[in-house]
Amino acid sequence: MKNGTVKFFNESKGFGFIIEESSSNEYFVHVSGLIDRISEGDNVEFELKEGKKGLNAINVKVI
């Protein structure tokens, strides 16, 4: 599992971005990849999965 912070999440559109703590890489997150409801600034744990446009955050949960 990786740790990061929610940079942005648009609930009405169902997507956002997470910044990984250790590398500062930014990853796309879709509502379908959430375990918990997230908001901007939340500290989260997540896994990565290859998507159509690169790596996506999945199994995202607030820590």
Language model feature labels by segment:
Residues 3, 26-28, 43:
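Well-ordered beta-strand positions in beta-sheet-rich domains
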Residues 10, 22, 50-52:
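A generic beta-sheet turn/junction motif
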Residues 13-18:
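Short aromatic-glycine-enriched beta-strand elements
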Residues 24-36:
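Beta-strand/loop nucleic-acid-binding surfaces
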Residues 1-8:
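Structural detector for short beta-strands of small beta-barrel domains
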Residues 49-63:
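OB-fold/S1-family single-stranded nucleic acid-binding modules
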Residues 34-45:
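Short nucleic-acid-contacting surface segments enriched for D/E, G, S/T with interspersed K/R
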